[in-house]
C-alpha cells in the first residue's frame, strides 16, 4: 500500500479521485467516517471543529487518524491501495506503507485551491491559512528527510497522477 500526503490544497483529493478513475483503489482518510477526528492535546477528548475557530483552539487541538482503524481498512483491499491524507499523528503509521509521496506546490497555488474548493472548509479562514503557511515548510522538509517522494502539483493533474503510478509500479 501507498500513502500520499501534503498540506491542505496541494491536490490530494483530486489525485485520489483520478487514481480511482484509472482503476487504482484509493481513499481519502478525511472522507472515511470516524477514521479521523480532532482531539484536545491535553485531555485527549474528541472535539468538534468548525471553520472560524480561533488560534487558541487550534493550538490546543490536533487532527489525528486512528491507526488501528486504518490498518483494518487497508487490510480489506486484496490488491494495492493508495491512501491519501494528512494527520498530526501520521508519523505513527507511515511505516505501514511501501512508499510515501509528498505532494507540494507553491503557497500561492495551494491557497488559491483552498479558496476555490468545495469539498472541505479547512483553510478558508484567515487563522487556518496562517497556520498552514507557518507549518508547510517544516512539514515538507521533515517528510523528505524521512524518505517521502516529492511530487510537484503545479503540473497538470494527469501528469502528477502518471508520475505517482510510475513510482508505484517501480
Q: Positions of the model-derived regions?
A:
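Hydrophobic anchor at the beta1->P-loop junction of P-loop NTPases
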Residues: 4
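P-loop (Walker A) phosphate-binding loop of NTP-binding proteins
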Residues: 7
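Walker A/P-loop
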Residues: 13
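Glycine-rich phosphate-binding loop used to anchor ATP phosphates in small-molecule kinases
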Residues: 55-97, 103-104
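Small-molecule kinase domains that catalyze NTP-dependent phosphoryl transfer to phosphate-bearing small molecules
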Residues: 90, 116-163
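Conserved phosphate-donor/acceptor-positioning beta-strand/loop module used by diverse small-molecule
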Residues: 96-117
Amino acid at each position: 500500500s501507498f500513502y500520499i500526503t501534503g498540506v491542505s490544497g496541494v491536490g490530494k483529493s483530486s489525485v485520489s479521485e483520478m487514481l480511482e478513475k484509472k482503476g487504482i483503489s484509493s481513499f481519502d482518510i478525511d472522507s472515511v467516517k470516524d477514521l479521523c477526528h480532532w482531539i484536545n492535546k491535553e485531555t485527549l477528548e474528541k472535539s468538534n471543529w468548525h471553520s472560524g475557530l480561533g488560534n487558541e483552539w487550534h493550538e490546543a487541538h490536533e487532527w489525528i487518524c486512528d491507526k488501528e482503524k486504518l490498518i483494518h481498512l487497508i487490510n480489506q483491499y486484496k490488491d494495492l491501495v493508495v491512501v491519501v491524507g494528512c494527520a498530526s499523528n501520521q508519523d505513527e503509521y507511515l511505516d505501514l506503507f511501501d512508499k510515501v509521496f509528498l505532494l507540494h506546490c507553491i503557497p500561492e497555488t495551494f491557497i488559491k485551491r483552498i479558496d476555490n474548493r468545495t469539498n472541505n472548509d479547512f483553510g478558508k479562514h484567515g487563522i487556518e491559512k496562517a497556520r498552514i503557511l507557518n507549518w508547510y515548510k517544516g512539514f515538507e522538509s521533515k517528510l523528505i528527510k524521512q524518505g517521502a517522494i516529492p511530487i510537484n502539483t503545479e503540473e497538470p493533474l494527469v501528469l502528477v497522477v502518471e508520475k505517482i503510478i510510475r513510482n508505484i509500479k517501480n
